[in-house]
Amino acid sequence: MPVALAASVLIFAALAAHSVAAQELTPRAYWPAPKGTKVLVIGYSNAEGDVLFDPSIPLYGVDSELNAGLLAYVQTLSLWGRSSNLIVELPYVWGETRGLVEDTPASRKYSGFSDLGITLSVNLMGAPSMTVEEFVAFRTDPHAILGASLKVIAPTGEYDETRLINEGANRWALKGELGYTLPLSTKWLLDFEAGALFFGDDDEFVAGKKEQEPIYSAQMHVIRRFSPGFWGSLNFNYFTGGRQTIDGVELGDVQRNSRLGATFVFPVAKGHALKLGYAVGWLTRFGTDFDQFLIT
């Protein structure tokens, strides 16, 4: 059962981490697992509405259906005596996008591998590296946790510089984040996360060199633990920034948006867990007004 609990926590972090990175909702991302835990993740997400892989695309009146399958591997480590996780994830995306390009209707169906993501997280306070027995004791008397993570997104996805819509972004991205978990009781937790996502340049974008300012994000989660491996949460985030420059021209696409979501995770067999998640746009200034469903 402890391993099933660890899997349920890490599965959500892995799948959400390869959504649009600044928009992700990741409850319990820094909750520890026993050292030596290994998790294979198979997941699926569906998003419908005003959503694009890349909001710099000059497409208006967007109506998309985006699907993503995910294969990921999670390894729990002990770094400097602290509980840590290494996550490697490879998504495959497919879907259809419709909209207007200079008042002309346009659409495209697409499928292919998106960009590879690698994340390393370390719990700096409150969660040392633990055996299964120590983890069981921690779960019954949890302490406040301070964690940090670094995610690298590599430009490995499929990309065609003659197309507006691509599966890969053709640029490097780096996200740093701090997370804090505050136990209110053995059943209730509060999660807080703050991060910054930095982008490299895309020198082959169809409309000219593309540059983008960082996107800053904050999350809060209210979590209820029902039994070992079974928990639910209400999730909220806010993200801002990300103004883009295309061929030297600044766009008016600064994001100041937020999303609301809910998550349920429960064990289905020894060493296995199922996660269901749903999120919607709440406050939308630019893009991100879409519904998303997740299952792993």
What role is predicted for each listed range?
Residues 38-40, 84-88, 118, 144-150, ...:
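Transmembrane beta-strands of outer-membrane beta-barrel proteins
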Residues 44-50, 90-96, 124, 152-158, ...:
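Transmembrane beta-strands of outer-membrane beta-barrel pores
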Residues 42-44, 71-75, 118-124, 150, ...:
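Residues on the lipid-exposed face of transmembrane beta-strands in outer-membrane beta-barrel proteins
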Residues 36, 63-71, 111-118, 144, ...:
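Residues that define the transmembrane beta-barrel architecture of outer-membrane proteins
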